[in-house]
């Protein structure tokens, strides 16, 4: 088996890792409570609160270094 580990130990470790990963994801979703609703009308550009406004400003003003 992988790394010289017996099948029983490998499956125990695999299942416990998977269980811990799923439990951790569930706890994070309970804590942060993400909004998983899908709006019927998509928002217009600029209405999203997650837009990176600093990135938008940098695109319009390219910085040229003087050497």
Curated annotation (Swiss-Prot):
Keywords: Membrane, Mitochondrion, Mitochondrion inner membrane, Signal-anchor, Transmembrane, Transmembrane helix. GO terms for cellular component: mitochondrial inner membrane; mitochondrion. The keyword GTP-binding does not apply. Highly expressed in brown adipose, cardiac and skeletal muscle (at protein level). Disruption phenotype: Uqcc6 deficiency leads to complete loss of mitochondrial respiratory chain complex III, resulting in growth retardation and a mild increase in blood lactate levels and significantly decreased exercise tolerance. The subunits of mitochondrial respiratory chain complex I, II, IV, and V are not affected. InterPro entries: BRAWNIN (IPR027858). Residues 1-8 are mitochondrial matrix. The chain crosses the membrane at residues 9-25. Disulfide bonds: none annotated. Coiled coil: none annotated. Residues 26-67 are mitochondrial intermembrane. The keyword rRNA-binding does not apply. It is found in: Mitochondrion inner membrane. GO terms for biological process: mitochondrial cytochrome c oxidase assembly; mitochondrial respiratory chain complex III assembly. It is a single-pass type II membrane protein. Interacts with UQCRC1. Interacts with UQCRQ. Interacts with UQCC5. Forms a complex, named COMB/coordinator of mitochondrial CYTB biogenesis, composed of UQCC1, UQCC2, UQCC4, UQCC5 and UQCC6; stabilizes nascent cytochrome b/MT-CYB and promotes its membrane insertion. Forms a complex, named COMA, composed of UQCC1, UQCC2 and UQCC4; activates MT-CYB translation. Forms a complex, named COMC, composed of UQCC1, UQCC2; UQCC3 and UQCC4; mediates MT-CYB hemylation and association with the first nuclear-encoded complex III subunit UQCRQ. Interacts with MT-CYB. Belongs to the UQCC6 family. PANTHER family: HYPOTHETICAL PROTEIN LOC691921 (PTHR28492), UBIQUINOL-CYTOCHROME-C REDUCTASE COMPLEX ASSEMBLY FACTOR 6 (PTHR28492:SF1). Required for the assembly and stability of the mitochondrial ubiquinol-cytochrome c reductase complex (complex III or cytochrome b-c1 complex), a multisubunit transmembrane complex that is part of the mitochondrial electron transport chain (ETC) which drives oxidative phosphorylation. Mediates early complex III biogenesis. Participates in regulating the levels of electron transport chain proteins, and therefore energy supply, in response to changes in energy demand. Also required for cytochrome c oxidase complex (complex IV) assembly. This is Ubiquinol-cytochrome c reductase complex assembly factor 6. It comes from Mus musculus.
């Amino acid at each position: 088996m992988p790394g010289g580990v017996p099948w029983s130990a490998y499956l125990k470790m695999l299942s416990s890792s998977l269980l811990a990963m799923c439990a951790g994801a569930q706890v994070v979703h309970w804590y942060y409570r993400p909004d998983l609703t899908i709006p019927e009308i998509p928002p217009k550009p600029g209405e999203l609160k997650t837009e990176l406004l600093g990135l938008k400003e940098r695109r319009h003003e390219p910085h040229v270094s003087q050497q």
